[in-house]
């Protein structure tokens, strides 16, 4: 499959700890709950992104000196509201918030990546800033690693032009961007309505590859060299 080269490279990574994240922590938010947003082949967005989030948590804890990794849910039985997610992140005072999702479309041929960062209605990033820059790393690495097209990285108010929510409220548009006290962004890792993509994400190694793409994005954002591959 197309992702095998990336997975074999991942297998060659030495498990030496990456340094440079000490004092920084991350709140991972696997979107939705239980079996929500069913994929075209019967594998839901909620189950997919939970496993990617847990893999990312494991990679960060085992391969870096990151201070703490938090996660909004840990199993497929939990039902977690948007308020519970953001309130948890704010209560623990996380340095960063990242929400993992997959996208949906009525066109089953569509399969693209997307990053959405918090934006005010005036076009400026929502403070505290950082989501826009992190998204610029994530969108490139995620798209290249998945080898699919992209809708690019957008401020959420600029993306949801069909809604007048930002004009009336000032923004951001997305709840998780609007109600977190730290820099944040939301990723869409392809479309679960695309048959080939929904089949790929059933594979545990593919989900771990997606987690590595987020890990590498975080390292690149911090200017930290990626682990040696070979």
PLM features: what roles do these ranges have?
Residues 27, 34, 99-107, 154-229:
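Active-site-adjacent mobile loop/cap segments within catalytic or ligand-binding domains
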Residues 54-66, 90-94, 102, 139-148, ...:
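Sec-exported extracytoplasmic/periplasmic mature domains
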């Amino acid at each position: 499959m197309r992702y095998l080269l990336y997975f074999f490279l991942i297998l060659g990574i030495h498990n030496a700890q990456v340094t440079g994240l000490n004092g920084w922590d991350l709140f991972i938010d696997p979107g939705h709950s239980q079996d929500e947003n069913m994929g075209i082949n019967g594998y839901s967005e909620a189950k997919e992104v939970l496993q990617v989030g847990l893999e990312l948590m494991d990679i960060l804890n085992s391969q870096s000196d990151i201070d703490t990794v938090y996660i909004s849910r840990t199993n497929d039985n939990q039902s977690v509201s948007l308020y519970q997610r953001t309130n948890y992140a704010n209560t623990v005072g996380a340095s960063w918030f990242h929400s993992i999702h997959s996208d949906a479309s009525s066109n089953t041929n569509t399969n693209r990546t997307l990053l959405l960062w918090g934006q005010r209605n005036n076009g400026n990033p929502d403070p505290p800033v950082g989501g826009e820059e992190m998204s610029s790393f994530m969108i490139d690495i995620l798209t290249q690693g998945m080898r699919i097209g992209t809708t690019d990285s957008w401020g959420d108010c600029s993306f949801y032009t069909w809604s007048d929510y930002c004009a009336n409220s000032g923004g951001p548009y997305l709840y998780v961007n609007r109600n977190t006290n730290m820099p944040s962004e939301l990723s869409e890792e392809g479309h679960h309505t695309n048959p080939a993509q929904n089949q790929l994400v059933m594979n545990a190694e593919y989900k771990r590859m997606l987690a590595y793409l987020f890990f590498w994005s975080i390292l690149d954002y911090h200017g930290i060299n990626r682990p040696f591959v070979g």
